[in-house]
Amino acid sequence: MAIVKCKPTSPGRRHVVKIVNQELYKGKPFAALLDSKSKSGGRNNNGRITTRHIGGGHKQHYRIVDFKRDKDGIPAKVERLEYDPNRTANIALVLYADGERRYILAPKGLKAGDAIASGADAAIKVGNTLPMRNIPVGSTVHAVEMKPGKGAQLARSAGTFIQILAREGNYVTLRLRSGEVRKVLAECRATIGEVGNSEHMLRQLGKAGANRWRGIRPTVRGMAMNPVDHPHGGGEGRNKGMQPVSPWGQKAKGFKTRKNKRTDKYIVRRRNK
């Protein structure tokens, strides 16, 4: 993994910082694990914008990643590491002993030729997936399930990890990267190690067009709009004249928006603000 600062041959290249990984496969992805990916432009089925700042971007194929890791007792070998345009982490193509191939998230330290396994009796080794009741307290894990069998939902981005703090009865206590401490059923699965490509945070796109390639449109401040477009718009000078709100009038600072009271009992400590 190398961090490359581009030479200022043009204004758009002057501030570009790239992450170069020589271990990534340079060929085409495995065709059987690709799916089509249509762009919505942030619109719903009525054609109305439901998510702002989305539109355009390069055409992409979706890589079908195995988040369940449910092939228990069947050893697998890592064939190669690949780039995935749909996520910040890299992915690994693994070949199971029964001949099936699957994509998984590539943990830090995993390389081509390594052996991995899944199941309750799997070894405590980077890349192996097993129920958290079988993982020692204090271990670092990623790709953590929130419900048994549902598939990984927590700690899937580049460089993220979760630490197992305690095990009490049917639950384990986890500390997330956000600082939140929460309980999850001990039967939920997790993968040993942290997600790879942790240098992703050091990259610099260098120009607005690089964001457009990724399907991200500009974000305009409400104060720069007209009153018809945003509550902060209009007025003389640079004064919003009110408490900061969203384009639809909801308070933007200090207003609690969490609605799922049913799962509050599993949160031991809220995330760091």
Curated annotation (Swiss-Prot):
SMART domains: Ribosomal_L2, Ribosomal_L2_C. Residues 229-239 have a biased composition (Basic and acidic residues). PANTHER family: LARGE RIBOSOMAL SUBUNIT PROTEIN UL2M, RIBOSOMAL PROTEIN L2. Residues 253-273 have a biased composition (Basic residues). One of its GO terms (molecular function) is rRNA binding. Keywords: Ribonucleoprotein, Ribosomal protein, RNA-binding, rRNA-binding. Residues 39-49 have a biased composition (Polar residues). One of its GO terms (biological process) is cytoplasmic translation. Residues 35-54, 222-273 are annotated as: Disordered. This is Large ribosomal subunit protein uL2. One of the primary rRNA binding proteins. Required for association of the 30S and 50S subunits to form the 70S ribosome, for tRNA binding and peptide bond formation. It has been suggested to have peptidyltransferase activity; this is somewhat controversial. Makes several contacts with the 16S rRNA in the 70S ribosome. Belongs to the universal ribosomal protein uL2 family. Pfam families: Ribosomal_L2, Ribosomal_L2_C. Part of the 50S ribosomal subunit. Forms a bridge to the 30S subunit in the 70S ribosome. GO terms for cellular component: large ribosomal subunit.
